[in-house]
């Protein structure tokens, strides 16, 4: 049992990383990765939202939508659940951590439309896994998102002191760096075989 959950963790963080393998959540990956502090704050917010959203959306889908034949509106219901969770985090951060709230800026409310969060809920719905597996997979996927975001922001902080050619400055260098990071993570492919 423990080895199965360890496989889910390794698979979601390294092998099938949401950002670097599935290309989900690229907007905050590029937008919040200029400083490690903001990347850590965004990672924490995404871990919380994705984990709680997985629990709530699993219950919603299995206890309300599927039994009543309302599966066709599950995406809309999932978006509403995610939006409510993001509002909760936004209010809590504004109250308790104002500097981090200001640093994240517009990207915090954009977690609502972060396709990684919605993607995790959709994957859990389609795979038909149990409650604990779904929540743990979403937690591991969020940790993988945060892991990639922090690594990428560390690289971008170092590159801020470099003097690249003019055509590579800004987002161009960030995209090339993200592509190289994605290639590096391809080295983990085949490490774990998961149904996700």
Please state what every model-predicted region is.
Residues 157-176:
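Interfacial loop-to-transmembrane junctions
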Residues 10-43:
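Juxtamembrane transmembrane-helix termini in multi-pass membrane transport proteins
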Residues 4, 183-196:
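Juxtamembrane boundary at the C-terminal end of a transmembrane helix
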């Amino acid at each position: 049992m423990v080895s199965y959950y360890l496989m889910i963790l390794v698979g979601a963080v390294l092998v099938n990383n949401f950002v670097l393998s599935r290309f989900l959540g690229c907007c905050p990956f590029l937008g919040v990765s200029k400083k490690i502090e903001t990347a850590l704050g965004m990672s924490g917010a995404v871990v919380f939202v994705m984990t709680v959203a997985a629990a709530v959306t699993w219950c919603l889908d299995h206890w309300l939508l599927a039994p009543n034949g309302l599966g066709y509106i599950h995406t809309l219901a999932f978006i509403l659940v995610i939006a409510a969770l993001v509002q909760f985090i936004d209010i809590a951060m504004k109250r308790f951590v104002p500097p981090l709230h200001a640093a994240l800026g517009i990207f915090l409310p954009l977690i609502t439309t972060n396709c990684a969060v919605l993607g995790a809920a959709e994957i859990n719905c389609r795979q038909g896994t149990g409650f604990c597996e779904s929540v743990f997979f979403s937690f591991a996927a969020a940790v993988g998102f945060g892991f990639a975001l922090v690594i990428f922001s560390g690289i971008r902080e170092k590159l801020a002191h470099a003097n690249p050619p003019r055509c590579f400055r800004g987002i161009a260098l960030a995209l090339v760096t993200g592509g190289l990071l994605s290639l590096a993570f391809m080295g983990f492919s085949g490490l774990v075989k998961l149904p996700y």
